[in-house]
A protein has these predicted regions:
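Short, solvent-exposed coil/turn elements at secondary-structure transition points
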Residues: 41, 184, 205-207
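Intrinsically disordered, low-complexity terminal tails and inter-domain linkers enriched
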Residues: 68-78, 202-209
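A short acidic, often aromatic-flanked loop/helix-cap motif at beta-alpha or helix-coil junctions
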Residues: 63-65, 186-187, 207
């Protein structure tokens, strides 16, 4: 769902070394299962790193998926679609333009040059700020924001799942099916989607386990 790394950008060489073992693990896992990686605002322009993992850029989001059984059969239960996105879409035009511009290949090549001649001061500053980030900050009135964001997806009645805000909120109401993931770095948990007569998200905790 994006932001898997504090900072990983295809053109910024100083961000690559730390990520290499994790990229290798993801590629190994992709031999056993399909892995979808939605780029976030801290990790993007990643296609060069992966051969098996399926990368979806900001421009390719949201991703609408048809849920099916483990045997590959299509389901016929209600709300059998789910829409995935990192969450930094459907923002104000100026902010959306800024996010798109920051992913520009030529701009990033230039920034990489500046970073190298300044002994990685730019990337180090970003990483330092990331280390100070409050991973469990609660956004005031996020439930209302979630409902507004849900409307922007235009697929009312189906589930929308986002990251980005890291609020660990599930809204399962008549007209709103919205799930905002928590920060994995803080919660150390993930969710399994169970499909019976309706969609359920089962949290799996990793705290205290050797993983």
């Amino acid at each position: 769902m994006g932001d898997i790394f504090d900072l990983l950008i295809g053109e910024i060489s100083a961000t690559h070394e730390f990520a290499k073992p994790y990229i290798k693990l993801l590629e190994e896992l992709a031999l056993k299962m399909e892995i979808i990686y939605l780029e976030g605002n801290h990790d993007f322009n990643l296609a060069r790193f992966f051969q098996r993992v399926k990368i979806f850029s900001l421009q390719e989001q949201p991703l609408k998926l048809n849920l099916h059984t483990s045997k590959g059969k299509n389901t016929d239960f209600k709300n059998s679609f789910i829409t995935l996105a990192h969450g930094d879409i459907f923002l104000s035009p100026p902010l959306q333009f800024a996010l798109k511009s920051l992913r520009n290949h030529y701009l990033l090549v230039f920034l990489n040059f500046l970073n190298q001649i300044s002994f990685n001061s730019i990337s180090n500053k970003i990483l330092k700020n990331q280390n100070k980030k409050n991973l469990f900050y609660k956004i005031e009135n996020f439930k209302n924001l979630a409902k507004e964001r849900y409307k922007k997806y235009g697929n009312l009645g189906f589930w929308v799942c986002e990251g980005h805000y890291h609020q660990n909120l599930i809204l399962d109401e008549k007209d709103v099916k919205y799930f905002n993931l928590a920060s994995f770095a803080y919660e150390r948990s993930f969710f399994v989607v169970e499909c019976y007569q309706e969609i359920k998200f089962q949290e799996q905790k990793l705290r205290g386990q050797n993983v």
